[in-house]
UniProtKB/Swiss-Prot annotation:
It is found in: Cytoplasm. One of its GO terms (biological process) is queuosine biosynthetic process. This is S-adenosylmethionine:tRNA ribosyltransferase-isomerase. It is an enzyme of class 2 (transferase). Transfers and isomerizes the ribose moiety from AdoMet to the 7-aminomethyl group of 7-deazaguanine (preQ1-tRNA) to give epoxyqueuosine (oQ-tRNA).
C-alpha cells in the first residue's frame, strides 16, 4: 500500500489548540466496522460501549517536562534539548537545536549550572547522546527546569500542564501524552469500574516518533520508531481471565494497542507479562491477536496511526468516518475529540 492511500482533507481550524474545560465533554464518534455504522455521541457515553466483564486497558505513562533551554559553557550560545529516551544511567538520547554547534565534548548549562549536559555521541537528524550531571534527584531537577513538550501542531501555550497528562499518569518517561486517555475523569473511571469493567494499566513511553511523518511512498520501506513498554504479571493475568470468560479487551489509544499486540505477536496470541522495546508497525493486512475494540483520537493524514486504525476497521470505512468527522466539525489531534472503534 502507498502512503497517499491514507491522506484526507483536514481544515486547519479543526486542529484543537487547547483542551476543553471538562475532559469528558469532548465528542465521541462510535463506529462499527462490521455493521458499517457511525453514531455521533459524547465521550462520557463511552460507558455504554463497555460491558461487565470487559477489560479497559490504559497506558499509565507520565509525560516528562522534557524540553530544556540552556547555553553552551564556552560561547554562551542558546541551546534547546528535547529528551527522547533514557539510554542508561544519566545518559539520554536527545534532539538538539542547533545541533551543528553541539559536537562531542560540548557542555551545556541549565538553570545557573544546577544541571549540566555533556555531548558524548552524535546521531543523525539532530540527535545526540548526552550525559547529565546534577545535585539531588534528576526528575526533581527536571521538574524545576524543564517545560512540557507539546506537539508541533499546537501553537498556543498550555495554561495548566496537568491537562497534557492523563488522570492516571504514574510512570515517568514519555515525550508526548497518550492522548486517547486525556478524556477520562476519575469520576468516569469509577462509574466504569462500578459497571463491572476491569481497569487494567500498562506502560508505553511515547517517543517523538509518534509525530514523525512517513517519508516513504511504499509502507514496506517505513522505518518505525522504537518505544519502551511494560505489562505486569497482575495485568496479564487479568487480561487472560477476561479473555477466558468471554470478555473483550478494550484498549485506550494506539499506544495500548501497540503494547498488547507486540505481546500477542511475541507469545503467539497469549498474553504474558513482558517488557522491552517495540517498533511494531500495524497496517492493513495485520491480524489482531489481543485487542477487540478501542478508543482513539483523530490522527494526522498519512500517519502510521491512521494506518493502525485502518488495519482494524478497514481503510475505506475509516476514511469515510474521518470525512464525516470533518463535516461535523470534530476537533482533531491531541486535544481533540475521540472515536470508539468496535
Amino acid at each position: 500500500m502507498n502512503t497517499n492511500d491514507f491522506d484526507f482533507e483536514l481544515p486547519e481550524e479543526l486542529i484543537a489548540q487547547t483542551p476543553l474545560e471538562k475532559r469528558d465533554s469532548s465528542k465521541l464518534l462510535i463506529i462499527d466496522h462490521r455493521q458499517k455504522t457511525m453514531v455521533d455521541s459524547h465521550f462520557d457515553h463511552i460507558i455504554d460501549q463497555l460491558n461487565p466483564g470487559d477489560a479497559l486497558v490504559m497506558n499509565n505513562t507520565r509525560v516528562l517536562p522534557a524540553r530544556l533551554y540552556g547555553e553552551k559553557t564556552d560561547t554562551h550560545g542558546h541551546v534547546e534539548l528535547l529528551l527522547l529516551k533514557n539510554t542508561q544511567g544519566d545518559q539520554w538520547e536527545v534532539l538538539a537545536k542547533p545541533a551543528k554547534r553541539l559536537k562531542v565534548g560540548s557542555q551545556v548549562n541549565f538553570g545557573d549550572g544546577h544541571l549540566k549536559a555533556t555531548i558524548i555521541d552524535e546521531l543523525e537528524h539532530g540527535g545526540r547522546i548526552v550525559e547529565f550531571s546534577y545535585d539531588g534527584i534528576f526528575l526533581e531537577v527536571l521538574e524545576s527546569l524543564g517545560e512540557m513538550p507539546l506537539p508541533p501542531y499546537i501553537h498556543e501555550k498550555l495554561e495548566d500542564a496537568e491537562r497534557y497528562q492523563t488522570v492516571y499518569a504514574k510512570e515517568n518517561g514519555s515525550a508526548a501524552a497518550p492522548t486517547a486517555g486525556l478524556h477520562f475523569t476519575t469520576d468516569l473511571l469509577k462509574k466504569i469500574e462500578a459497571k463491572g469493567v476491569h481497569l487494567v494499566y500498562l506502560t508505553l513511553h511515547v517517543g517523538l516518533g509518534t509525530f514523525r511523518p512517513v517519508s516513504v511512498d511504499n509502507l514496506d520501506e517505513h522505518d518505525m520508531h522504537s518505544e519502551f513498554y511494560s505489562l505486569s504479571e497482575e495485568a496479564a493475568q487479568t487480561l487472560r481471565d477476561v479473555k477466558q470468560a468471554g470478555g473483550r479487551v478494550v484498549a485506550v489509544g494506539t499506544t495500548s494497542i501497540r503494547t498488547l499486540e507486540t505481546i500477542g505477536s511475541k507469545f503467539q496470541g497469549d498474553i504474558q507479562a513482558d517488557s522491552g522495546w517495540t517498533n511494531i508497525f500495524i497496517k492493513p493486512g495485520y491480524q489482531f491477536k489481543v485487542v477487540d475494540a478501542f478508543s482513539t483520537n483523530f490522527h494526522l493524514p498519512k500517519s502510521t496511526l491512521v494506518m493502525l486504525v485502518s488495519a482494524f476497521a478497514g481503510r475505506d470505512f475509516v476514511l469515510e468516518a474521518y470525512r464525516h468527522a470533518v463535516d461535523e466539525k470534530y476537533r482533531f489531534f491531541s486535544f481533540g475529540d475521540a472515536m470508539f472503534v468496535n
